């Protein structure tokens, strides 16, 4: 448990980026040239990357090379491809507006009741981690409830009342893409303006002096409207992750409509990804203590990424299987299922061990033994000194980010379910490997700055990051 002492408030950096003294914890104040170049590249090309993948499925049966070859050989032009792309429609705009409004309603106006009758589930009003400025925010954790209500209404309306077709998401997939982009850019722009003009917590704002970096990575740490509507928690969990399983169900329904059956590969993708989604919402309180909430500021990276990148690229396996139905042999299907379940077990148990250690302040058993830890201290931006412990027992003694290793095993299982016919469904494992490796290195850089020599003692005790004996 953290204790506090030695209050000495530092100066805060001004919006024009001029220097002032800073705390030892939080996102970097200065921007190096590589980070800036990477950010400008993503701002320019990430929307195009999403469009290219979705267009390749719609017009080229999920081939990533065919569009480029058509353009290179003169068989098609960019104008030809764009002309075949469905535009935004009034129906898609209405669907998307209704969807987002419904999720806002569930998030903001319906207090959680699941924690009252589900044993082991922690919901309702919960505290987040302490921010770099020393603030502890409160959250209404009701994601599981929102997921359950949404999916019950989906099945009732689509299959019992027949108010809409269960293929409605697939049938409007590209028009919905334009709506998601509009929301992503709108909320990111609003968050930046809010950070300058009326931030929720000015002490947790960071200005680098670079417009592109501020827009991409965000200024405010926890932008809010009112007491409870937290931008970061809402957009991280809703509407993208609630939609994830609905999108997959719509893809499965389309496969049924086109071919008269649903393949075992589509079932595998739906089941394995649903486990991940349900795990996220079951452990939403734990999520309040992860890097997304505890370190990232809210900018385009989270705002646009959660609206567009996540729902469109994380569901590529289901989309691919609509165009290329794959029926796996029973041994292959069981092997992929086992890989996904083992990966999930490692991911969940690794996180559970850390959560158990934190909740009990180390007074627990991990793998039948009293856990070992490295004692650390750090100073927040308000000048207060805090103490914490870094776990070196259980899976956390195997590698410093073994939860990421389990996550990558599950990600690989999603992709393997699609067979080896095309590269497109394997984008997810490639992307997740890059993302989690970068996150691993970024987290370690942050922890090195935060804990100093204590971090060196920790890395000596647990020398490997992701793969024991290798990396």
UniProtKB/Swiss-Prot annotation:
GO terms for cellular component: endoplasmic reticulum membrane. Keywords: Cholesterol biosynthesis, Cholesterol metabolism, Endoplasmic reticulum, Hydrolase, Lipid biosynthesis, Lipid metabolism, Membrane, NADP, Oxidoreductase, Phosphoprotein, Steroid biosynthesis, Steroid metabolism, Sterol biosynthesis, Sterol metabolism, Transmembrane, Transmembrane helix. Gene3D superfamilies: 1.20.120.1630. InterPro entries: ERG24_DHCR-like (IPR001171), Sterol_reductase_CS (IPR018083). It comes from the Eukaryota. Belongs to the ERG4/ERG24 family. This is 7-dehydrocholesterol reductase. It comes from Mus musculus.
């Amino acid at each position: 448990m953290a204790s506090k002492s030695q209050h000495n408030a530092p100066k805060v950096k001004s919006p024009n980026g001029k220097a002032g003294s800073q705390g030892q914890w939080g996102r970097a104040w200065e921007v190096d040239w590589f980070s800036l170049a990477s950010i400008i590249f993503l701002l320019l090309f990430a929307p195009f990357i999403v469009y290219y993948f979705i267009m390749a499925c719609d017009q080229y049966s999920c081939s990533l090379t065919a569009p480029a070859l058509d353009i290179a050989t003169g068989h098609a032009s960019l104008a030809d491809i764009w002309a075949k792309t469905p535009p935004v429609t009034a129906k898609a705009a209405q669907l998307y507006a209704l969807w987002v409004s419904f999720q806002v309603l569930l998030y903001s106006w319906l207090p959680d009741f699941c924690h009252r009758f589900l044993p082991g589930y922690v919901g309702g009003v919960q505290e987040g981690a302490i921010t770099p400025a020393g603030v502890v925010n409160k959250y209404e954790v009701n994601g599981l409830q929102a997921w359950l209500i949404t999916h019950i209404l989906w099945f009732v309306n689509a299959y019992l009342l027949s108010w809409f077709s269960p293929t409605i998401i697939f049938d409007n997939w590209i028009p919905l893409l334009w709506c998601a982009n509009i929301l992503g850019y709108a909320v990111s722009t609003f968050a930046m303006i809010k950070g300058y003009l009326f931030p929720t917590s000015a002490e947790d704002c960071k200005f680098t002096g670079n417009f592109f970096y501020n827009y991409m990575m965000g200024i405010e740490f926890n932008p809010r409207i009112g007491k409870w509507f937290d931008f970061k928690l809402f957009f991280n969990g809703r509407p993208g992750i609630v939609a994830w399983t609905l999108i997959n169900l719509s893809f499965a329904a389309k496969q049924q409509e086109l071919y008269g059956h649903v393949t075992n590969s589509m079932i595998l993708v739906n089941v394995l990804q649903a486990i991940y989604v349900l795990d996220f919402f079951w452990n939403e309180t734990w999520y309040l203590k992860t890097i997304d909430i505890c370190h990232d500021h809210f900018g385009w990276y989270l705002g646009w990424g959660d609206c567009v990148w996540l729902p469109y690229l994380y569901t590529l396996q289901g989309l691919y299987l609509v165009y290329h139905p794959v029926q796996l042999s029973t041994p292959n299907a069981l092997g992929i299922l086992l890989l996904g379940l083992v990966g999930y077990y490692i991911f969940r148990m690794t996180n559970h061990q850390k959560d158990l250690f934190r909740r009990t302040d180390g007074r627990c058993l991990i793998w039948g033994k009293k856990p070992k830890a490295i004692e650390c201290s750090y100073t927040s931006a308000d000048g207060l000194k805090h103490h914490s412990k870094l776990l070196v027992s259980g899976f956390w003694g195997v590698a410093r980010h073994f939860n990421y290793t389990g996550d990558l095993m599950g990600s690989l299982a999603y992709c393997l379910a699609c067979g080896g016919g095309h590269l497109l469904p394997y984008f997810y494992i490639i992307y997740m490997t890059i993302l989690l490796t970068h996150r691993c290195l970024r987290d370690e850089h942050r922890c090195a700055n935060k804990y100093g020599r204590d971090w060196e003692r920790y890395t000596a005790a647990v020398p490997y990051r992701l793969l024991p004996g290798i990396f």
